[in-house]
Amino acid sequence: MIIKIGDTITDERGRTATVEQIGIGTTKSDPAGELGLKADEYDLELNYLGAITFGDYWCYFNQIRSVNKTDIKVLNENWIGF
């Protein structure tokens, strides 16, 4: 599964938000990738250490459960009362 900046993801806790940053760990002492490389996209099948920030949250790569590649748009004319 490939994740990119701007994708909407859901983690194992059910939190959903837009990916803002992808950090890849380059040492064992930095598993979240805070000091490592920053990327615009990452293939989770590579199994590197690292983490993403999304909305007010962050999670390790192995905690990502789904990636929504399409934006969810709510049209005002579909609401009752408009």
Spans of features found by a protein language model:
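Short, solvent-exposed secondary-structure boundary/capping segments
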Residues: 26-38
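Intrinsically disordered, low-complexity, charged/polar segments
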Residues: 41-82
